[in-house]
């Protein structure tokens, strides 16, 4: 087994540039397709998860991430599924933190449902994790259990408290769902801003299994913003985090609110990211099915040059934009794979 602390990386190369002149500096890595929740817009209730043999080992994930960092990635986000349910995940995070210490990586972060944060917040902070996103769509315990199918809201809130006590900045991600949580969004904003947390609202995306009621729950954020403007004073700001969100400040709370609108506003012109699955498939776009098998390149050779070439070939196919559209007539997703596999 390669020593991840001592293994030399590939020789420095020019930053990765896609066919449309966009620098790829952000890698999102789904470390597992498993989750302890079953959120209705993310996965089916009775999911069949990948067998262990199909997953990249933690050492392989480290090697892949390290090559991407050598090729110009400055921000690394671990996702899932739920990343903190992957066995020995802190070993991987601890190893990856060496890139923060060397200055090769600007940020190591993760998106989580919060269920495991009370257990891991201190270790995450010790590894240099300074910011995390927590997915939280409602503060109503009954609705929370409905949308997550299995989730316990109190456990998530305990996790958020633990993260903040560990000096980790928490941002709340909420999917806006028509006739489910739309009336609660102002309350969620006040609650989060009152605790020093930004909020980002997200439109539901047509990925994976789409049930009839889910299609009907699509809520354009343009409508949400108009509703919020009747209660709050919103001011556009140029704040950016390297992602697709457009931000406003809310005068009444003093906090920031982001909008991610893949369905009503195409943010592709500034896309700086690619997504790696736990099986080693690289997706150049969340809303396209084109992929590259990096597991094959990873296991064919100990040479990182071979892996680097496979990454370059994949980046050369990064598309101009996504294909998201909700097909109400046929009730089918525009992208068949589940968000839990691609990484939310």
Curated annotation (Swiss-Prot):
[4Fe-4S] cluster 2 binds at residues 268, 271, 285. Monomer and homodimer. GO terms for molecular function: 4 iron, 4 sulfur cluster binding; cyclic pyranopterin monophosphate synthase activity; GTP 3',8'-cyclase activity; GTP binding; metal ion binding; S-adenosyl-L-methionine binding. Pathway: Cofactor biosynthesis; molybdopterin biosynthesis. The gene is moaA. Its cofactor is [4Fe-4S] cluster. Keywords: 4Fe-4S, GTP-binding, Iron, Iron-sulfur, Lyase, Metal-binding, Molybdenum cofactor biosynthesis, Nucleotide-binding, S-adenosyl-L-methionine. Belongs to the radical SAM superfamily. MoaA family. Catalyzes the cyclization of GTP to (8S)-3',8-cyclo-7,8-dihydroguanosine 5'-triphosphate. Binds 2 [4Fe-4S] clusters. Binds 1 [4Fe-4S] cluster coordinated with 3 cysteines and an exchangeable S-adenosyl-L-methionine and 1 [4Fe-4S] cluster coordinated with 3 cysteines and the GTP-derived substrate. [4Fe-4S] cluster 1 binds at residues 35, 39, 42. PROSITE patterns: MOAA_NIFB_PQQE, RADICAL_SAM. HAMAP family: MoaA_B. This is GTP 3',8-cyclase. GTP binds at residues 28, 77, 111, 171, 273-275. It catalyses: GTP + AH2 + S-adenosyl-L-methionine = (8S)-3',8-cyclo-7,8-dihydroguanosine 5'-triphosphate + 5'-deoxyadenosine + L-methionine + A + H(+). S-adenosyl-L-methionine binds at residues 41, 81, 135, 205. GO terms for biological process: Mo-molybdopterin cofactor biosynthetic process. Its EC number is 4.1.99.22. It holds the Pfam family Radical_SAM. Residues 19-245 form the Radical SAM core domain.
